[in-house]
């Protein structure tokens, strides 16, 4: 492998502890029409300067962000406190907070872009596909101590990609139609250049070379333009997991964050023990992403390089049992146990379809149900 110039080396800040942080994207919907509202700038201005609320690509979106947290419970409490303030302001202006991977019936062409140079450049380059990004998700950061661990952890974590996507899948509808997918968001987002599945590098120098080549050829200007579903965040000293569709309620989010935290810490500890982490061929990883997006919790996923297969919910049962000691050490055993409730009672995409069926296909009722799930 070719080395990179010293100026292209990437410092990884490193985290002395396996801390966790969460970014949760919300759409604003009109309280009466349930369509999207492009009033995020007004809401953010009223909230005032804070590191906990950010703007996003579209003016219908606000992002709520935690600080650096020790465990899932602390992260959920952080989000809860911020959301109470945000929702009060949103409701005072005749809107509600809504979260799912997509809005059931909103049309992308009527949405306004946030005024920022980086967003303007994104749309200038990506054109029609960039304008289609009417999607919302959740990002989870987990602290990693050293750069040499990052790429092996990311490459191995891809084995659990379908589990995370199937559990969070919440985007069956697009522009008023049922797509037949559990997560249409996952299929949409990968259309952007530099988005989608990460390359399965095994060393930090490989990643440095990739970033160097991307910049030299004009594909990116800044490292944050690498929009992988799982990516390093060198300045934070974390691995950032961006697999999830938008999550509509804080209890479900807590379970997904706990699962993510446990998975990353488990891999980190196995590296410390001298274990070579398991990886699958990229063609299996790619197929698993598609199966989870298409079939959600009914997906039969590929388990390993030997092409063994299993229903994702059956594999989740064993995975949750295996992770229990890790969860206890991270003080998130209760939240991890909640993962099973998602697939026993139905993921968001299943709940949305059930509501639509009960209301003769009325997608306004689906928005109502999702808004109501955000109990604070």
Swiss-Prot record:
Matching Pfam families: GCS2
Source species: Mycobacterium sp. (strain KMS)
UniProt catalytic activity: L-cysteine + L-glutamate + ATP = gamma-L-glutamyl-L-cysteine + ADP + phosphate + H(+)
EC number: 6.3.2.2
A single BP term in Gene Ontology: modified amino acid biosynthetic process
Family to which the UniProt record says this protein belongs: Belongs to the glutamate--cysteine ligase type 2 family. YbdK subfamily.
Function: ATP-dependent carboxylate-amine ligase which exhibits weak glutamate--cysteine ligase activity.
One MF annotation (Gene Ontology) recorded for this entry: ATP binding
UniProt entry tagged with the keyword Transmembrane: no
Protein's name according to its UniProt entry: Putative glutamate--cysteine ligase 2-1
Alphabetized UniProt keyword annotations: ATP-binding, Ligase, Nucleotide-binding
InterPro entries: GCL_type2/YbdK_subfam, GCS2, Gln_synth/guanido_kin_cat_dom, YbdK
